[in-house]
Amino acid sequence: MATYEVLCEVARKLGTDDREVVLFLLNVFIPQPTLAQLIGALRALKEEGRLTFPLLAECLFRAGRRDLLRDLLHLDPRFLERHLAGTMSYFSPYQLTVLHVDGELCARDIRSLIFLSKDTIGSRSTPQTFLHWVYCMENLDLLGPTDVDALMSMLRSLSRVDLQRQVQTLMGLHLSGPSHSQHYRHTP
């Protein structure tokens, strides 16, 4: 079980982008979260029993923070990588796909994506990051685990056919396979 001290130390070591990734994976969205907001969210999840040590470890792994796995959780990142290759993820294929796309888009792509969807999202909530854009689109029911058409359309508009194909490939198994809940261990 992750202690409050470990959670606070993890939170202190994460940058703004990493904080957003961890919260996205945990199904909590706070755009550009502050340290206090992240600590509060992690504590609340722990108190609710929704944040376990293995879940935190996979979050940090997916956020690319192998240093924190090693230094704070005392896990060998290579061990965790091998373990995750042989077991189901805590996260849905949709979350992992969104995270993959987030890592592949440059700042210019994200600005273009936001500009192209400005009429759809509206001016009251202008996203600053890709994950914030995803959150806005999900709130409008235009994007979700069973509907990635808007994302693929936007990637096509950005001339990122490479990413569009990757999304199709990553989500293809999910959309055509058995029910969503059978693909991953649980939704945090």
Curated annotation (Swiss-Prot):
An example Gene Ontology biological process: regulation of apoptotic process
Keyword Repeat: yes
InterPro entries: DEATH-like_dom_sf, DED_dom
Alphabetically ordered keywords of this record: Activation of host NF-kappa-B by virus, Apoptosis, Host-virus interaction, Inhibition of host apoptosis by viral FLIP-like protein, Modulation of host cell apoptosis by virus, Repeat
Region forming the signal peptide: none
Superkingdom field: Viruses
Domain DED: 2-74, 93-169
Keyword Repeat: yes
SMART domains for the chain: DED
PANTHER family, per the entry: CASP8 AND FADD LIKE APOPTOSIS REGULATOR, DED DOMAIN-CONTAINING PROTEIN
Function field: Plays a role in the modulation of host signaling pathways by acting as an activator of both the classic and the alternative NF-kappa-B pathways. Thereby, initiates an important range of cellular processes to promote cell survival, proliferation and protection from apoptosis.
Subunit structure and binding partners: Interacts with host RIPK1, TRAF2, MAP3K14, IKBKB, and IKBKG. Interacts with host CADM1; this interaction is essential for chronic NF-kappa-B activation.
Protein name: Viral FLICE protein
Species: Human herpesvirus 8 type P (isolate GK18) (HHV-8)
Organism taxonomic ancestry: Viruses, Duplodnaviria, Heunggongvirae, Peploviricota, Herviviricetes
